[in-house]
Regions:
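Active-site-proximal specificity loops/subdomain of glycosyltransferases
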Residues: 70-128
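C-terminal catalytic/acceptor-binding lobe
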Residues: 203-292
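Cell-envelope/extracellular polymer assembly enzymes that use nucleotide-activated donors
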Residues: 19-21, 51, 252
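Short, acidic, metal-binding catalytic loop of nucleotide-sugar glycosyltransferases
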Residues: 38-49, 59
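Conserved catalytic core of nucleotide-sugar-dependent glycosyltransferases
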Residues: 138-236
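Acidic donor-binding/catalytic loop of UDP-sugar-dependent glycosyltransferases
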Residues: 62, 111, 115, 119, ...
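A conserved acidic beta->alpha catalytic loop
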Residues: 55-66, 83-88
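N-proximal low-complexity "stem/linker" segments adjacent to membrane-targeting elements
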Residues: 1-42
C-alpha cells in the first residue's frame, strides 16, 4: 500500500465520528461551482456531521442561483447573498511601484469578506472539530487527498493544499505562492520576484512525498483545528517591499497562530488542488496569439 492510500484509509477512520465546517467566499464562479459542490458533499459525507457556510457577493453570472438551489436542497448549507458597494475600497490608494494583486486595497477587502464566515461561526455559537476553508472557483479538488490529510500521525495545526496550475507557456507551477511563507522566513519581506520564483521551485511536489513544514500556506483549501482559529480574524500586515505592499490575508491567521504557539503548519503533497483547466489555458494562449 502506498503512503497516500495508507493516509487515506487512516483518515477515513479518524474523522468518521467528527464534525467539520466548510467556509468560503464566492463571486462569479458558476462554471466550476457545480462540480465543486459535489466534491464538498463527498468530503462532508466522511464526517459524522458537516456544515457549509458561504458568503457570496456581486456575482454577474449564475453563481447566486446555483448557491440558492444548493441551500434549498441541502439543509447543511447556509448561503448569504449580497451586492456590496465596493467603491469604498477604491478610496485606499495603491502606491506607485506596487502590484494591485498584492496591495492594501485588495487585501483589506479580502480580509473583510473572509471575516464574515468566522464571525458567523462565533455569532451562531457553532461547534466543530475542524474548519475547512476552500475556494470554490478552483478547477478540481482531490477528495481522496483531502481525506488523507487526517491520516497523518504527527501533531498538526493547519494542513494546506498542494495547489498547481499552468503558466502561459504551459509549464507546471505551484499556484498560491502569495500565501506561501517558508518555515523560518516569516520575518523576511516578500517580493514579486520571490513570489514568482517559488511558483517553479515548489512546482514538483507530488503524491507520496512527506508533508512539508511551512510558516504559512493555503492553496485553495486548508484544514484548521476549530479550537485554534474560531476566535481569530483576518487582518492586513504591511510588507512594503519589492512590489508587494501587504502580505496575503491568509498569512495573518498564521501570524496569530504562531503567537499562540500553534505553528505546526504543513502542505500535504497528496491534497492536490487544480486551479485551472489546461484546455482553458491553451485556449487563452491561442486567443492571445490571434488577437496580436
Amino acid at each position: 500500500m502506498t503512503p497516500f492510500n495508507s493516509l487515506y484509509n487512516k483518515g477515513i477512520d479518524k474523522i468518521k465520528n467528527q464534525d467539520v465546517i466548510f467556509c468560503s467566499i464566492v463571486r462569479d464562479c458558476a462554471y466550476n461551482l457545480k462540480h465543486n459542490i459535489s466534491d464538498i458533499e463527498k468530503i462532508g459525507s466522511y464526517f459524522k456531521k458537516y456544515t457549509v457556510i458561504i458568503f457570496e457577493n456581486n456575482s454577474q453570472d449564475n453563481t447566486k442561483m446555483i448557491l440558492q438551489d444548493w441551500a434549498r436542497n441541502n439543509n447543511c448549507v447556509y448561503i448569504h447573498i449580497a451586492n456590496y458597494e465596493e467603491d469604498r475600497f477604491k478610496e485606499i490608494p495603491i502606491p506607485q511601484g506596487y502590484n494591485s494583486a498584492n496591495c492594501k486595497r485588495r487585501i483589506t477587502k479580502m480580509a473583510k469578506y473572509r471575516n464574515q464566515y468566522l464571525e458567523y461561526i462565533a455569532s451562531h455559537n457553532l461547534k466543530s472539530d475542524y474548519i475547512i476553508i476552500v475556494d470554490l472557483d478552483v478547477a478540481q479538488i482531490n477528495v481522496k487527498g483531502v481525506i488523507s490529510s487526517f491520516g497523518i500521525e504527527q501533531e498538526w495545526d493547519v494542513i494546506a493544499s498542494n495547489s498547481y496550475s499552468r503558466s502561459p507557456h504551459l509549464k507546471r507551477r505551484y499556484h498560491d505562492t502569495y500565501a506561501l511563507i517558508e518555515d523560518g522566513t516569516e520575518n523576511i519581506p516578500q517580493s514579486e520576484k520571490t513570489i514568482d520564483k517559488n511558483r517553479y521551485l515548489w512546482a514538483n511536489i507530488n503524491y507520496n512525498m512527506p508533508f512539508i513544514r511551512v510558516f504559512s500556506a493555503f492553496g485553495g483549501l486548508a484544514i484548521y483545528k476549530y479550537e485554534l482559529i474560531k476566535d481569530l480574524r483576518y487582518f492586513v500586515i504591511d510588507n512594503l517591499y519589492g512590489g508587494v505592499e501587504v502580505k496575503c490575508e491568509h498569512v495573518s491567521l498564521h501570524t496569530e497562530l504562531q503567537k499562540k504557539g500553534h505553528n505546526r503548519t504543513y502542505i500535504n503533497p497528496n491534497m492536490k488542488i487544480k486551479y485551472q483547466n489546461t484546455l482553458s489555458t491553451i485556449f487563452n494562449k491561442i486567443k492571445e496569439f490571434i488577437l496580436r
